[in-house]
Structures are given as C-alpha cells and as structure tokens.
Amino acid sequence: MNETIAPARLPRIGMVSLGCPKALTDSELILTQLSAEGYQTSKTFEGADLVIVNTCGFIDDAVKESLDTIGEALAENGKVIVTGCLGARAGEGGGNLVREMHPSVLAVTGPHATQEVMDAVHQNLPKPHDPFIDLVPGGFGVAGVKLTPRHYAYLKISEGCNHRCTFCIIPSMRGDLVSRPVGDVLSEAKALFEGGVKELLVISQDTSAYGVDVKYRTGFWDGKPVKTRMLELVQTLGEIAEPYGAWVRLHYVYPYPSVDEVIPFMATGKILPYLDVPFQHSHPDVLRRMKRPASGERNLERIQRWREACPELVIRSTFIAGFPGETEEEFQHLLDFLREAQIDRAGCFAYSDVDGAVANELPGMLPMEVREERRARFMAVAEEVSIERLRRRVGATMQVLVDHAPALGRKGGRGRSYADAPEIDGVVHLLPPEKISKQLKVGEFTRAQIVGVQGHDLVARPI
C-alpha cells in the first residue's frame, strides 16, 4: 500500500527592518538569500522559528527603537539574531552594546553582513534540504526580494564612507567606501525595470564618491565599457530606464564639483531633476567644525548655476541646528541660506550628542532647549519656502506616479510627482477623475493638473 508522506514544514523566519533605505536593501539581500535556500517568512514573532532584527544605531531615538524591538522579539519568540548598525556599536562597558542589553540573543553582526547572518541562521535553524531549491543560485547583486511596493525600489551602489564628519559615527559602523561593480549595479537596475519598477532610487552613504575607492576603473555592461563614476553611472541608468518610461532619482549626493556635470544631464529628462544633497549647514566656520568633505562657501552660487542649467531642479537637503559652538549669527546665516537657495524640501535635526561622535568633545555645547528652539525656527522658515515653491505649481500639468488608488481611483487617490521621493517628501492628492472612463492604477503614471496646495502636498485633478 502506498502511503502519502506529508511534506515537512519548512522553517519560518521573521524579519524586522529598521532605519534608513540603505538598511532596507541589506534586509532585502538577506530575505532573497533566505528565500533561495527554502526558508519561509513569518509576519509575526510568534509564528516564526527564529527572528532577525536589522537595526539602526545612528541617533538615540533609533537606538532605543532598535533595543525595544529586540526585547519584544525575545519576549515573544526567544530566538533572535541581530544585524545592522547597532550591532557594531560598543556599550558603556566596552563590549558589544546589544549583548550588554540583551545577552540572550543568538548572534550579533554589523551592517551589510548577509553571509554572517546566514551563517548564524544555519547554525540555529538548519536550512531545509530540497533538491530543486538547492539548485537555485544565490540572489546577491540581482533584483531579488523587495520590501518596497512593486513600482519603486532602492538601488544601493556602494557601502560605507571615507569621510570623518565630526557629528557622524556611520564610518565606524559601516566602514570605508566600497563601490559595487558598475556592471552589477546596471544589471540589477535592468532586472528591476523588467520586473515592473517605475522608479529607481539610487542610494549610498555618498553617491558622489562612487568609484573613488577603485580609482574610477572601467567596468563592462551589455558588452560596453562603463566607467565606475557617478556621471557615467547615471547616464547609463537613464538610458536603461528610457524604454520603460521609468524614473531615476538620486539620493545622498554630496556637493562635490562633479555634481555640476550631472545637472545638464538632468535637464535632458533622462533622469529626474531632483537632487538630495546633505548640506548640513551653510556657514563656513560651522562646516569646518563639522569637517564636511566639500567646501560650502560657494554653495549658494552653485545652486544658482544649477537652476540656470536645469530650471525644473528640485533640491532636498538635511541640516543640523545647534551644532557645538554655533552662534546666533551663524544660525542666522543658515536661515538666510535657506531662503536664498530656495531649498524645496528641507529636514532639520537638533544636534544630538551621539555616543562616539568627535563633535561631543568640541567646545560650546549648547543647551538642548536652545538646539530645539533653533530647529523649530529653521523648520518654520523651511515650511514658508517649501509652500511658496509649491504654490508656483498651481495650474501646471505634471506626471504623477500613483501610489494609492482604491476602486481604480473613482474616489481619487494619492501619488507623487518628480519632486516627491517616497516617505520623506510630500504627496499629490488626486481628486476623482472627471471622465468616467479615466482610471487610476497603482504603479502607473497619470497626467494631472495641479489645482491647489494642502500643507506640504499638492492637490491635482487627473486628466
């Protein structure tokens, strides 16, 4: 008599990804490899055989969130592997911070450590044996599992940073710059577009420095030589994206002179005229205390030239208020810069004395209430500038990528224009279409006429 043998239950792994988009891409690599090896995923801690927590360790709030999440996973599951930036931080006792706070975790790794995480998984939850799954090649460097909606994805081009800004501890956690081979980056981009991605967000710790570590050596893609450098990379990305009608958006672009070469290419429409530039401050003395890698003395002039070359350019930036030693005059310089530069989207942090940051030892540490007060004043000016620039768009017709459209958009929806990166910028609220035949589909583009401004967002009618 033949007996049917029930298939063995495949091991399940829970995954929590905290922090920035760069950490998200690390999580995607881990999940891709887990999937290739036959592991299944669990949406709950209780339903998993093991939980992986990818942490953030940059600012105090992020550290607390990461430690709390690890604690929750331990309480609800008991078997936890920790990876990410917090895994590389030392505690007050000199040992590993995570192990000091949660000694029962199974393993701790730093960021960008897919193989170390997989080794820890194998040690604590042996991979399922499947003669078919075992033939599947690894998913490193290709468009594997994605944690973003299907129509947009992050493309990480490098890991680490060569700079030693006094307020930052990222190099101590993620190491020096390591650029991905240009052929691998372009192959992943092509695969993402073929898979339906309509917006590619290029990320790294320092996008402008892409290729510095390999002396801009020439790589190959599609049988053609391509230099490992930001300009050649984005030019080729634009060419790959064009047949798909897809967007390419640049993030974390330090204001080096090389950026000037990219702006005219943005003006052609091959990549989005959108630049995420972390200026951090405007006053030369503050920038010197920060040890910023690019001189800021001529940033205002450069921005004016950028806008002349590409009038549609949108600039997003982040700043720090209340840096040690910052005078009221230096802070006013920053507010004046914000107004004159007409920064479209600006975020601001009150200086936080992160453990291990060199800036903590600088003279002139300001009281927290002063730092927070300056941050609030900064954001008030930033809001004025942003809303005024949004108002200029009323009456214009823009292409909008639809992110949300219940009932095919008959009651309206939500999307983003080229000026809006997901999660960090505003959105475009789409009114119900006037034409009955007009439908809105998530992940598709629609033309819309801007009819109003609502806070940091636009209101538009699909046409």
Curated annotation (Swiss-Prot):
Residues 391-463 form the TRAM domain. The keyword ATP-binding does not apply. [4Fe-4S] cluster 1 binds at C20, C56, C85. It holds the Pfam family Radical_SAM. Transmembrane segments: none annotated. Residues 11-126 form the MTTase N-terminal domain. SUPFAM superfamilies: Radical SAM enzymes. Catalyzes the methylthiolation of an aspartic acid residue of ribosomal protein uS12. This is Ribosomal protein uS12 methylthiotransferase RimO. It comes from Paracidovorax citrulli (strain AAC00-1) (Acidovorax citrulli). The lineage of its organism: Bacteria, Pseudomonadati, Pseudomonadota, Betaproteobacteria, Burkholderiales.
